[in-house]
Amino acid sequence: MIYGIVYYTKSGRGYLFQQAFEEQHAMEIAGKMNDLLATGATMYNDKFYGKLDLRDVEYFTVEPSSEMY
């Protein structure tokens, strides 16, 4: 199964951030991103993903591919 790391904005909209084949790996990524949010960071920059403005992001979570829309 594929798991999506999804972030939700303060307005309640969910967006796919990344995908992982293992639930544990997806949970680790979501946890690291939530830790980053807790520091007050406003920008995420990754050589694979690119830039993500964190100012409107509420939290990251993991959802099975069957629940993603």
What is the predicted function of each stretch?
Residues 13-24:
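A short, exposed loop/beta-hairpin motif centered on an aromatic-Gly-Thr core
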Residues 7, 15-17, 34, 43, ...:
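Polar low-complexity intrinsically disordered regions enriched in Ser/Thr and small residues
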Residues 36-69:
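Short, mixed-charge low-complexity intrinsically disordered segments
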Residues 1-13:
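Short aromatic-glycine-(Arg/Gly/Cys) micro-motifs in beta-strand/loop hairpins
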Residues 12, 32, 48-50:
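Terminal low-complexity, poorly structured segments
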Residues 23-34:
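Short, surface-exposed linear segments at secondary-structure transitions and domain or protein termini
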Residues 1-2, 34-36:
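Short, surface-exposed loop and linker segments with low hydrophobicity and enrichment for Pro/Ser/Thr
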